[in-house]
């Protein structure tokens, strides 16, 4: 599976379901590194302006409609949580995440 068409199908419904609330979407793991096999997970990074149970339910609803939904996993957080990360975690996220929508640079603490 090529992750790009999958992401092209995922991103518009996510942006529509959470208008103005999505700060960043990226891909990690084997797809992000170009090492994915036929059974690889789709490792997402999604950062919202604020994240609670309602927002997680919306994200889950969008993901459940996707092909290979059972392979979607990853990290969902909000701006405030990400801004408070220690530098070593922020560096790892920067190095291991391929941006698809938005930029991590404005969301992470300065290096």
Walk through the language-model features, giving the residues of each.
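A generic fold-level signal
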Residues: 20, 37-39, 85
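Conserved NTP/Mg2+-binding pocket subregion across the NTase superfamily
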Residues: 56-111
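Generic marker of residues within folded, mature protein domains
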Residues: 15-17, 34, 83
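Helical scaffold of the NTase/Pol beta-like nucleotidyltransferase catalytic core
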Residues: 1-26
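Catalytic metal-binding acidic patch
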Residues: 29-61, 73-76
């Amino acid at each position: 599976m090529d992750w790009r068409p999958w992401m092209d199908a995922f991103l518009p419904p996510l942006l529509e379901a959470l208008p103005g609330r999505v700060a960043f979407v990226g891909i990690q793991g084997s797809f992000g590194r170009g090492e994915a096999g036929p059974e690889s997970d789709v490792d997402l990074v999604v950062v919202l302006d604020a994240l609670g149970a309602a927002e997680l339910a919306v994200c889950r609803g969008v993901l459940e409609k996707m092909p290979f939904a059972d392979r979607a996993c990853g990290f969902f957080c909000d701006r405030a949580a990400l801004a408070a990360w220690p530098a070593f975690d922020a560096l790892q996220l920067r190095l291991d995440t391929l941006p698809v929508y938005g930029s991590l640079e404005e969301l992470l603490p300065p290096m």
